[in-house]
Amino acid sequence: MALRFPRFSQGLAQDPTTRRIWFGIATAHDFESHDDITEERLYQNIFASHFGQLAIIFLWTSGNLFHVAWQGNFESWVQDPLHVRPIAHAIWDPHFGQPAVEAFTRGGALGPVNIAYSGVYQWWYTIGLRTNEDLYTGALFLLFLSAISLIAGWLHLQPKWKPSVSWFKNAESRLNHHLSGLFGVSSLAWTGHLVHVAIPASRGEYVRWNNFLDVLPHPQGLGPLFTGQWNLYAQNPDSSSHLFGTAEGAGTAILTLLGGFHPQTQSLWLTDIAHHHLAIAFIFLVAGHMYRTNFGIGHSMKDLLDAHIPPGGRLGRGHKGLYDTINNSLHFQLGLALASLGVITSLVAQHMYSLPAYAFIAQDFTTQAALYTHHQYIAGFIMTGAFAHGAIFFIRDYNPEQNEDNVLARMLDHKEAIISHLSWASLFLGFHTLGLYVHNDVMLAFGTPEKQILIEPIFAQWIQSAHGKTSYGFDVLLSSTTGPAFNAGRSIWLPGWLNAVNENSNSLFLTIGPGDFLVHHAIALGLHTTTLILVKGALDARGSKLMPDKKDFGYSFPCDGPGRGGTCDISAWDAFYLAVFWMLNTIGWVTFYWHWKHITLWQGNVSQFNESSTYLMGWLRDYLWLNSSQLINGYNPFGMNSLSVWAWMFLFGHLVWATGFMFLISWRGYWQELIETLAWAHERTPLANLIRWRDKPVALSIVQARLVGLAHFSVGYIFTYAAFLIASTSGKFG
């Protein structure tokens, strides 16, 4: 009996129903709730599992390199990045016979293949990889790192190598090591790689270990560094006629401030990127020496936070008590980490397309669309997770005595004001934005488009103008040709920036109008509503006027029994659950907007977006319906084409999405009756009744069914849009 799953909970292991399996899976990673857990074991388990996570990541990236080297066309892509389609891997068994084999044999391959829309070819090319041998070497190195990570994870579970709790709670040492070691040293190492390998490769020079010490990355070597003539490293940059990967038009500079894009690759100058990483390395190496550890000098985090008491007394005791609260709560730390990572991931999405760092990626439209969408969805899930763990912190880890009258306590004290303000903002945005869209819809329907309410986003246009965009005629700051900022920008810093901002061949500061104004406010509505639900869930997690003892019921409870009305749907988990729907909804609008604006830009018919995006029917007809036509045509009476797999995924995504509602709408009683009927039939069916199981089948709990429904809804939603996005973009641009 003792060895039944789950071993971490004897209570669950003895459960005679299938609840044992589902609750076991649900709580497998909730180490805090396991039998015999101690604080020390909790920290050690999490620490060891991080190594496992790293091993999986290294194995996965190794697999990417290996499959491209084995089955891809990297070497022929390198010869002509704009016209050869990059291959991700082969397709072993193309269904549907010869037509499928022909449809999927592309990119110069001998058999059916998948095309890569991840941007890895452009990335590897930019950082100096050129041959399949390079890719195999990288794959083997990452495989080695994966093995090392697994060994390290195992090692740190052995008694002699288990770190103590005090080691995990040494905030200053952790800050120093993460800032200097993780960010500082790795940024410096990356600068080294760019300067010694990638920049020479972009100029046609092949640097590897065998000639690494013979090839000077700069004609004067380390001379300028030691003599203080650092500006020499910026002299003679690549010319505007430079052909990437060759010596033609190449310069000798290694650290520059050119600004703008390389004319041929439409990506940031590699020498600018190296300079950026060197600056980051310097900042973080300094930052990693600021906190007090062995030598009694530097900042103490506790002293810093305790000293943060606003002089006017308007924020009470400020940050007093926060050090111990944060340092003793893994959920608080995880919440902060997820919030930061979520914002960074969304920023990655925004910057990867507007300031592309990888050569030729800007001309690979499907990859641009896929990467933007991918990073925005990831950001959404991570950000909602931040609030979930914030709520768990309030339930499990928050100590009111320790935080008396500090900023945390005051957040809880005036939560009504916070929640009602967010509610007001959401209602205002929602009614006004929908009102404008619906008004415009009606005007179009009645044949009077001139009666639409079209609002120019003048403040946003003014901000774009301040950054140098001249087409609006605002004549302010960088767009004022007579101003000192403009003149300095021409010579001292980033001379390429102003050209880039005013060129129409990139995605920097796209021209905006009334359609952008409306969808911007629709997205603002989504963001504020998602935030409202998440913030309310966290701030009410300990209790509310309706249910003052809520924290005693834990993070996820369905209701407090039948005798206490109004306690259903108000657990902190329910808030997270509802917020994920709004998050998906919002990112849907974000990605629709990005994609439609860009396909009209790439096709040269921006007027279609400008004219159709001001009313709802325009979005439905001219974006969704018009662009799904290729998708619905993946299979037709005349055979099939290379979009057929996306057509299938589009259908399959809808199916998964719709299945979600089956779990979301019907509750336990329905399923319990169905299960008992099926079990009855099973026991009376010859042959089938030879198979028996020990656990009595029971329906999922309310909370579990919601999770399963939410998972299907999310996965189906993303599958459907991914298929639409990739098929509609690749169908147009290849």
UniProtKB/Swiss-Prot annotation:
Entry's EC annotation: 1.97.1.12
InterPro entries per UniProt: PSI_PsaA/B (IPR001280), PSI_PsaA/B_CS (IPR020586), PSI_PsaA/B_sf (IPR036408), PSI_PsaB (IPR006244)
Biological process per Gene Ontology, one example term: photosynthesis
Membrane topology, from the record: Multi-pass membrane protein
Top class in the EC scheme: oxidoreductase
GO molecular function: 4 iron, 4 sulfur cluster binding; chlorophyll binding; electron transfer activity; magnesium ion binding; oxidoreductase activity
Keyword Thylakoid annotated: yes
Reaction it catalyzes: reduced [plastocyanin] + hnu + oxidized [2Fe-2S]-[ferredoxin] = oxidized [plastocyanin] + reduced [2Fe-2S]-[ferredoxin]
Residue numbers binding phylloquinone: W671
Thylakoid recorded as keyword: yes
Residues that hold [4Fe-4S] cluster according to the record: C559, C568
Keywords (A to Z) from UniProt: 4Fe-4S, Chlorophyll, Chloroplast, Chromophore, Electron transport, Iron, Iron-sulfur, Magnesium, Membrane, Metal-binding, Oxidoreductase, Photosynthesis, Photosystem I, Plastid, Thylakoid, Transmembrane, Transmembrane helix, Transport
Transmembrane feature ranges: 46-69, 135-158, 175-199, 273-291, 330-353, 369-395, 417-439, 517-535, 575-596, 643-665, 707-727
Subcellular location: Plastid, Chloroplast thylakoid membrane
Positions contributing to chlorophyll a B1 binding: H654
Textual note on the cofactor: P700 is a chlorophyll a/chlorophyll a' dimer, A0 is one or more chlorophyll a, A1 is one or both phylloquinones and FX is a shared 4Fe-4S iron-sulfur center.
Binding site for chlorophyll a B3: M662, Y670
Any Gene Ontology CC annotation: photosystem I
Biological role: PsaA and PsaB bind P700, the primary electron donor of photosystem I (PSI), as well as the electron acceptors A0, A1 and FX. PSI is a plastocyanin-ferredoxin oxidoreductase, converting photonic excitation into a charge separation, which transfers an electron from the donor P700 chlorophyll pair to the spectroscopically characterized acceptors A0, A1, FX, FA and FB in turn. Oxidized P700 is reduced on the lumenal side of the thylakoid membrane by plastocyanin.
Subunit structure: The PsaA/B heterodimer binds the P700 chlorophyll special pair and subsequent electron acceptors. PSI consists of a core antenna complex that captures photons, and an electron transfer chain that converts photonic excitation into a charge separation. The eukaryotic PSI reaction center is composed of at least 11 subunits.
Family: Belongs to the PsaA/PsaB family.
NCBIfam families given in the database record: psaB
Name of the featured protein: Photosystem I P700 chlorophyll a apoprotein A2
Native species: Solanum lycopersicum
